[in-house]
Amino acid sequence: MPKRKRTGLSSLGTLITAMSISLMACGAIMSLNSSCDNDSPSFSDDNHTGQTEHFPGLETVTLPEDLYSQIKEYIGFTISFNKDNKTPNYVAWELLGDEVKNDIDRTDNFWTDPDIEGCPSTKDYTRSGYDRGHMCPAADQKWSIEAMNDCFVMANICPQDHKLNAGAWNTLENKERQWAKRDSAIMIIAGPLYSADDTNRIGNAKVRVPGAFFKVLLAPYVEEPRGIAFVYPNMTSPDNMQDYAMSIDELEKITGYDFFPALPDELEKTVESSFSFKEWNNSK
């Protein structure tokens, strides 16, 4: 994932050293994930350079060998694009708590990337009956004009039911921003889900309409790292978030994808094998 320039700690070794000094000042040797006041450590402001600098490769997803994938890194996110579906396989990005406080204006300037094979045009969605649904939402890219512009690339877009886009999916996106502020940073991976029955296509480019959408969340900087996944059908969906929640392992069985293969094995097992919506929704 492209590195965003921030001041502060530049490596995990520096991070450990700085935290060790802080912990010794508390009068006790504590684990890396502890703090003097028993709250989750804060990596915001000048002490957070972005989680992918400390856990390299979190944006990487291992896909089935027979699935076409063209990877491209944009300013604030990474896309795996599928030229057959004319939609992304997935879009991955980190969201820092401080970034959601910024106020770069939304552009709505959708554009076709000539470097992406099969990237559709915004006209392919015109009068299709579907929204141009962002996988990485514009509201997550308000920290940079360039990131905001990149967010409107058509490679980041899928045909999405309007009531889902403006309803339950939007509710989840808003909740993610709250969680990012609370947890200092979260990793997000989102994309469409297709089955053999999903044969509908729109526009001259024949953009394939997905039957559902998935989202994977990881909070690695809390006292007990946690993960969760969601699957929403591409239709009007009741706004009851926990009904769409599942473990990351469950989603991996559905998609055939391997999320967060760069994590240490034990940590990956911990965050992927189970989930607690209550912990995500209520943790302080």
Region locations from a protein language model:
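Domain-level detector for secreted/extracellular nuclease and nuclease-toxin modules, and
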Residues: 2-284
